[in-house]
Amino acid sequence: MHCYAPDLYCHNIADVPFASLAKKNIVNICLDVDNTLAKRGSLLIDYQTVKALDKARQNGHIKNICIVSNIIWGRSREERVRKIAEQLAIEHYFAARFWERKPNAKPFLEAMRLMDSQPENTAIIGDQIFTDVVGGKRLGLFTILVRPLGEDHWTTRLTWRRHREIRILKHLGFE
């Protein structure tokens, strides 16, 4: 399969079929923060997202969740990741610094270590092909791409990543 092609493409986290994933023994979930769980820079998480994650956990479709975010630098950004994890009652999170950011292996390997999971039973849910999907594919994770919740970081706009992603999604038949 193409390294840019997500295994699943959903509108948002609430649309992810956690029951179907659990039937395939994919019960450990890595979650991106910016524009996946919350709009960039925000602490507000959509009610439908909270409800979907809670329901999946209560039904046993999710065993573990680890938030994996590229914070690049800054204590305030790491604090935001911690607060979001607390809101969702998520025990594990990894705030990747500049030199270890996604799509590098370290954030995913650390998340799997924290969840005591393996690639074959772990998924990554994120809004970017070049970080979340490519990084997950490199390690053999099940990759789920969701539409971004809000505006991109200036570096994403500067490098035209989102424009390239749209072209890739159209080429793959997702858009």
Regions found by a protein language model. Give the residues of each.
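Active-site residues of response regulator receiver
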Residues: 32
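Asp-based, Mg2+/Mn2+-dependent phosphohydrolase catalytic module
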Residues: 2-29, 38, 43, 49-175
